[in-house]
UniProtKB/Swiss-Prot annotation:
Binding site for GTP: 14-21, 61-65, 123-126
Protein name: GTPase Era
Source organism (scientific name): Listeria monocytogenes serotype 4a (strain HCC23)
Region (G1): 14-21
Region G2, residue ranges: 40-44
Primary gene name: era
G5 as annotated region, ranges: 152-154
Gene3D superfamilies to which the protein is assigned, alphabetical: 3.30.300.20, P-loop containing nucleotide triphosphate hydrolases (3.40.50.300)
GO terms under cellular component: cytosol; plasma membrane
Length: 301
């Protein structure tokens, strides 16, 4: 007799840049959470769905937890903390190469207040010596009792199969929430805007990134050629930022558009014509109605 089907929700939490999105993308096998080396890259809960014949795991990739500096920051931390209560299991990801960080203490204090089981995932183990890894494990073990401590490399996939095995062991019998071939519950529009924002983050200087939102104004399919026309607007807070994103003779914007278009074509499997504009909206991160316009819905969280 076959084993009953299991399912559950797993939150991936940790300081900014510890590799949460890389891990999610490695497990799902397709790029659904935006990745960049800049802090606070992930803004909304991106759900990745991993389905096998035995189980379905729904992953929630939360923003990096940090001390908020503005309303958008408040919003991002609130999402992450609320998530702890809603899920069946929490992955707390740390970066082995940087060791214990100030933000980890903040997260551990929050984790101590929830009943949800917590796995400590020590990521980037390929970057440190084995003896340093053992010291790190002991250090975190003294701070909190974790249900499992699993060293991994999200980028290379080291020990990820073992992680998924341990995760399955912690799941309850449950339904298949999503169709077998579905890997995320976010609409295509959201993922397209995230892919454009990823290129802005990767290509522009430090002052621009966190002041950027991307709004998809329209997506149209040409019935004859099957080609998609996507109109997108990059929203920034200052005209100097607009200048940086457009670049000399429009070169930076051209680069952003070209790289984003390739990623979008890979995602959708069809040819894309991408038109990108840049618009200044002063202090949008502190204005609630703008936050809602750009996809940050307070009610949803």
């Amino acid at each position: 007799m076959s084993e009953p089907f299991k399912s559950g929700f797993v939150a991936i939490v940790g300081r900014p840049n510890v590799g949460k999105s890389t891990l999610l993308n490695h497990i799902i096998g397709q790029k659904i959470a935006i990745m960049s080396d800049k802090a606070q890259t992930t803004r909304n809960k991106v759900q990745g769905v991993y389905t096998t014949d035995e189980s379905q795991i729904i992953f929630i990739d939360t923003p990096g937890i940090h001390k908020p500096k503005h309303k958008l920051g408040d919003f991002m931390v609130k999402i992450a903390l609320n998530t702890f209560q809603e899920v069946d299991l929490i992955y707390f990801v740390i970066d082995a190469s940087t060791g214990f960080g100030r933000g980890d203490e903040f997260i551990i204090e929050k984790l101590k207040n929830v009943q949800t089981p917590v796995f400590l995932l020590i990521n980037k183990i390929d970057l440190i010596a084995p003896e340093d890894l053992f010291k790190l494990i002991e250090q975190y073990r003294d701070l909190m009792e974790f249900d499992e401590i699993i060293p991994i490399s999200a980028l290379q996939g080291n020990n990820v199969p073992n992680l998924l095995e341990q995760t399955n062991a912690n799941l309850e019998i449950g339904p298949m929430y999503y169709p077998k071939d579905q890997i995320t519950d976010h609409p295509e529009r959201f993922i397209i805007s995230e892919l454009i924002r990823e290129q802005v983050l990767q290509l522009t200087r430090e002052e621009v990134p966190h002041s950027v939102a991307v709004v998809i104004e329209g997506i149209e399919k040409n019935p004859k050629t099957e080609k998609l026309t996507i109109n997108a607007t990059i929203i920034v807070e200052r005209s100097t930022q607009k200048g940086i994103i457009i670049g000399k003779q429009g070169q930076m914007l051209k680069q952003i558009g070209m790289r984003a278009r390739k990623e979008i074509e890979r995602l959708l499997g069809s040819k894309v014509f991408l038109e990108v504009w840049v618009k200044v909206q002063k202090n949008w991160r502190d204005k609630e109605h703008y936050l809602q316009d750009y996809g940050f819905d307070r009610e949803e969280y």
